[in-house]
């Protein structure tokens, strides 16, 4: 019997997840289908009950349901609980179990382009929203010891840092202070929507002098190269856009559902082609 997987969100028509997962199922010879489900916020509880009743094997969760879905699940993974959001649900032994692969996926994508273990690197995160929280918690879980957070509202960054119970050296900075100190960091990670299409000339921070060999990463992938990444490249940085994070979080969800890891590069090239790259 064909297994059914999917993604729920609103809007959902733009989602690249069905393309990516259905290709992986076919490539690995798995008899399954992945479908995009448009779910209105007020219908989320009913949708989750329906997915469970129909025996859907697993789902991804996207905007605006990542937080709201948690109250409808049977169990939540500790890291997802700490992040405060779920993006992947596994239907296991009659229970719906929630996970968050956004942050872990990002960490794996970052490690893939780093020549050294991430725990040896000093990092700066820009932003303090949901994406930043997922990445921050996952970096801490991966053993990174120095992670500062810069945000327009410094108090929000302080609250995020205070929520972590792990031993990690973190400071909350203004964007102005972060701009002055950017040369001190091995990795700069842009987690906001600043610079996303159509506001492609915007940047959260002016890039100046960077540490030699610095990695500069932006979770945005539309455009492929934000002004932030463009300026970082001109300053000699190794740059990474948001496609890697998107692909790795999807691949981790796929592995949780099937026990098989899909071809990461195949997934990435498929997404790039679809986006016109």
Swiss-Prot record:
NADP(+) binds at residues 127-131, 219, 242. Its EC number is 1.1.1.25. Pathway: Metabolic intermediate biosynthesis; chorismate biosynthesis; chorismate from D-erythrose 4-phosphate and phosphoenolpyruvate: step 4/7. It is an enzyme of class 1 (oxidoreductase). The keyword Ribonucleoprotein does not apply. Involved in the biosynthesis of the chorismate, which leads to the biosynthesis of aromatic amino acids. Catalyzes the reversible NADPH linked reduction of 3-dehydroshikimate (DHSA) to yield shikimate (SA). This is Shikimate dehydrogenase (NADP(+)). It comes from Bacillus cytotoxicus (strain DSM 22905 / CIP 110041 / 391-98 / NVH 391-98).
